[in-house]
A protein has these predicted regions:
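Active-site-proximal beta-strand elements of phosphoester/diester hydrolases
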Residues: 40-45, 144-147, 191
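His/Asp/Glu-rich mid-to-C-terminal helical/loop segments that flank catalytic regions of hydrolases
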Residues: 198-226
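Mid-sequence, gly/pro-rich, charge-dense loop/helix-turn segments that line enzyme active sites
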Residues: 77-165
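Short glycine-/acidic-enriched loop or helix-start segments at secondary-structure transitions
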Residues: 14-17, 78-80, 98, 157, ...
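N-terminal short beta-loop-beta anion/metal-coordinating cradle
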Residues: 1-57, 63
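A C-terminal functional module that forms or caps the active site or interfaces directly
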Residues: 148-190, 195-199
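Structural motif
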Residues: 66-69
Length: 226
């Protein structure tokens, strides 16, 4: 099986890569490995939606994969998903995609600039309706995500986004990854490990090492059982 792991930064897959065997065909962004009978490429896109969409689309246009995994860290809006928890994100949306109207916010769909179900959107969200069949993936809790350019760290804006979308987690790349996969018809799964609770910015409370270790273990299990 040919598998692609997409990540924003090398640090987020630092616990996965040592479990793979380096192979030929490595570049600065797209590195090749093997595990058992699988060929595993790792694409490092850089942080944010623009970089993720651009590099994913470029690779998808010239390469074919049996499954694509997005591995990264995220912030959690739910106490039931504490740092170190790995989540299978099956729906995502771009939280800031719209316009301000005084104190109100209008989504791009509410502005009638984009249809609620205009491909690849479903009811204003990006939905992975047919994730890969994988025993390790099936064991993960499923969550709804938002993708942002500005990570939340203000109590008022956190309250507003929870009221509007009620998300489980947030990241800076997930929706762009899902958009590219849906457009290109690539089987995919977005897998994220919680590094912090979404609250007023408090780096001392973050558990990045625990999140990266948990993410690496989860991604390796998915690859191993593919």
């Amino acid at each position: 099986m040919r598998i692609l792991v997409v990540t924003a930064t090398d640090a987020e897959v630092a616990a996965l890569v040592p479990s793979l065997v380096p192979a030929a065909g490595r570049t600065s962004r797209l590195r090749s490995y093997t595990h058992d009978r699988h060929a595993v490429d790792v694409l490092t896109t850089g942080v944010g939606m623009v970089a993720t969409a651009m590099w994913c689309s470029g690779v998808f246009a010239r390469e074919r994969y049996d499954v694509v995994l997005n591995g990264g860290v995220c912030g959690s809006f739910r106490p039931a998903l504490p740092p170190g928890t790995v989540v299978h994100v099956t729906t995502d949306r771009i939280a800031e995609f719209g316009a301000e109207d005084g104190e109100a916010f209008l989504t791009v769909q509410e502005l009638q600039l984009l249809g609620e179900d205009e491909f690849p959107w479903t009811c204003g969200r990006l939905v992975n309706s047919v994730p890969p069949r994988n025993g390790a993936l099936d064991q993960l809790p499923v969550g709804d995500a938002i993708t942002v350019n500005t990570v939340h760290g203000n109590e008022a804006t956190i309250a507003r986004v929870v009221e509007r979308y009620n998300p489980h987690v947030e990241s800076m790349e997930g929706a762009a990854f899902m958009y590219a996969c849906l457009v290109h018809g690539v089987p995919f799964a977005q897998v994220r490990a919680v590094s912090n609770i979404v609250e007023r910015r408090n780096r001392n409370a973050w558990k990045l090492r625990e999140a990266v270790d948990a993410l690496g273990a989860a991604l390796f299990a998915i690859i191993d059982r593919s």
